[in-house]
Amino acid sequence: MNNEKESALTAMNTNGRSKLTALLYKTLMSFVGVLVLSMGESFMLAANMGMDPFTSANLGGSSLLHMGLGNFQLMVNFVIFIFVLFSDRHMIGIGTVINMVLVGYEIQWFSAIRQSLFGTANSLTLQIINAVIGLIIFTYGASMYMTANVGVAPYDGVAPIISRWTHLRYRVVRVIQDIIVMGLAYLVGGPFGILTFIVAFCTGPLIEFWTDKVNQKIYNLI
């Protein structure tokens, strides 16, 4: 009888350690994904052909208030985080905090590094090269961060909540959300261009490609 109890306790402890280890690996995967997508954003910023709607709006707002992107985006994210927390706390996880806190600062950091290494993209060819590199890196990082499944970014949590409240399809709500934020980005003078539309409406297939071909396989090893 004692042996059975000891075996059960050992199994429970092992299972607990396994879950903790898996969570740590998923958290690391989310962290690396956010790091990579931020690097991609820095190349898109250098291309000067627009950014994703949310970052574009934050860049415009931070410029108007003479603040660094990291500080401004953290404040905006915190406000959205409170909304998501009280609306559907199940969407919140360690990945939410990682994305909320780090992305703005990492874009600043990688932009400085990219500028020191490669300089200004002062021709259309260099702009296109930076845009393509940025999109590839950004979508891979976004796929990795989402595949880790340890919480969504505050901005990404808004559409599912509104969709549930209004009974509209998620995709419809997300498109409306992005269009509204695109308009806001334009009004506050954020980087607005062809990349803004591409990231908002056309990157899904590339993110799915990275998920299916690479990141889901990494996740399955955890």
Where does each model-flagged region fall?
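Core subunits and conserved enzymes of cellular information-processing
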Residues: N2-I222
